[in-house]
Amino acid sequence: MTKEQYQSWSAPFRSPRGERWLNRVNFLLTRLCYAAYPLCLLWLAATRDSRGIPALLVPAVSFLLVSVFRNLYNAKRPYELLEIQPIIHKDKKGKSFPSRHVFSVFVIAMTFLWLCPPAGAVFLVVGVLLALCRVIGGVHFPRDVIAGALAGIAAGACYWLIW
């Protein structure tokens, strides 16, 4: 992504109203997933569903692995390299690849897809929308969110491969 591409993609959101809207959508999509997942785990525990252990372990272990990789790779963010003002305000330096927000939403989506396919499909759409927000918001390059999505999908494939 070049500075010009970013400016073109983010132009429709470069107003106080557009910035508020994008930040709210980013916040709400993130919170939706981060609220739904623990509720899912509680439901699995309450019903003594044997899928609860893998539903906890797959996201937890893969989240840890992605976090370690991000720290080691330490890719810069668009606002560090392109001299842009991001719409989603962030002061963090580096640790952009892969997007952990997008990874998390996709591994959660895969968890739901394994447990309840219609809910999983909804969360996959949420993941795509969040990925778009993160790029338009200027906090990730397209490669960051694509890698995050693919890593989340790959981690979630463990449900079908192992259990």
Q: Where are the regions a protein language model picked out?
A:
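N-terminal transmembrane-helix/juxtamembrane module of multi-pass inner/ER membrane proteins
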Residues: 1-37, 50, 66-94
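Membrane-interface junctions
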Residues: 27-31, 45, 115-118
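Alpha-helical transmembrane segments of integral membrane proteins
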Residues: 36, 50-58, 119-122, 143-147
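Membrane-water interface at transmembrane helix exits
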Residues: 42-46, 66, 70-74, 113, ...
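Small-polar-interrupted transmembrane alpha-helices in polytopic inner-membrane proteins
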Residues: 57-70, 121-133
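Membrane-embedded catalytic cores of phosphoryl/pyrophosphoryl-handling enzymes
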Residues: 83-163
